[in-house]
Regions:
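Catalytic glutamate of the conserved HExxH
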Residues: 187-199
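Metalloprotease/metallohydrolase-associated module, dominated by Zn2+-dependent proteases
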Residues: 9, 14, 132-183, 200-249
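A contiguous catalytic/ligand-binding core that recognizes phosphate-bearing ligands
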Residues: 104-106, 116-144, 148-149
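Generic alpha-helical secondary structure signal
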Residues: 18-21, 182, 186
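Generic detector of ordered, mature protein regions
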Residues: 21-23, 40, 50, 124-128, ...
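Propeptide-to-catalytic entry region of secreted or membrane-anchored zinc metalloproteases
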Residues: 1-124
Length: 249
């Protein structure tokens, strides 16, 4: 059946502290005394500016190249300010591999969750796609990926072709997540549960479109699963979580 981690460590990069606090409080309340939840900081090493610049994706097929000095400097400034550059896409699995190298090796039994503003992509069908979450060690949730990853309603792309993207945002603002969306902390809770189920069972997703473990590919699916569904977890996963908690008690 699996087992819950004894400890969950949350990291934030470029996101407001209240985002991490919201996940912290939620998991603390959800899991009770069986799991310790705490916050930490990713301590980057001296390689970071070059490594991060070298992980930039240059094209739809995952093209990369030797970084320019200016790109390395931009990454260095971003690390100093704890504010990653906007609009840059990174190779998601390679980014995860680098972050993994910064974590203590003895902590693999713990669940590490990094919430970042970086745009992360992975290859599927020969094309790189922006991801909302990457599941592994550590698990990484991208707030920018939550906004840019799941496809927006078809109406959005029609407005974009007509040059009226801002008009669409004004009319249909509740149908898609936006950067700095006040609903993001609530959405992050559901994605943190996906990371939890991945760590505990190896199976983070659910086919029930109303379950917060549903793997949404469209914004309206994400909005429904995380914000509008009459229930948080489907009966199957609600019962599974209770069983996992008993095993941790």
């Amino acid at each position: 059946m699996g087992k819950l981690p004894k400890e969950i460590i949350l990291y934030g990069e470029g996101v407001p502290e209240e985002y991490i606090d919201a996940i912290h409080s939620y998991l603390d309340d959800k899991l009770g005394y069986g799991t310790i939840v705490r916050s930490g900081y990713i301590v980057y090493d001296e390689r970071a500016p070059f490594v991060l610049a070298s992980l930039r994706i240059r094209g739809p097929h995952g093209e990369r190249r030797e970084p320019l000095p200016l790109e390395i400097e931009v990454e260095k400034r971003g690390l100093e300010r704890r504010s990653p550059p906007k609009g840059v896409i990174y190779d998601g699995w390679e980014f995860m591999r680098y972050i993994r190298s910064l974590l203590p090796s003895h902590s693999i039994s713990r669940l590490h969750i990094l919430v970042t503003t970086r745009l992360l992509s992975t290859e599927e069908g020969g094309i790189h796609h922006i991801r909302a979450i990457l599941l592994g060690y550590p698990c990484i949730i991208s707030t920018s990926g939550l906004v840019e990853g799941p496809a927006k309603p078809r109406k959005f792309y029609l407005f974009r072709r007509l040059g009226n993207e801002e008009l669409y945002q004004a009319i249909e603002e509740d149908n898609s997540l936006r950067h700095d969306d006040p609903r993001l902390p609530l959405v992050l809770r559901g994605y943190a549960l996906q990371a939890l189920f991945y760590h505990a069972t190896g199976n983070p997703f659910c086919k029930d479109k109303g379950c917060c473990l549903y793997n949404a590919h469209w914004q309206d699916e994400l909005i429904y699963a995380q914000l509008e569904s009459p229930y948080e977890l489907c009966p199957l996963h609600k019962n599974l979580l209770e069983e996992l908690k008993k095993g941790n008690g």
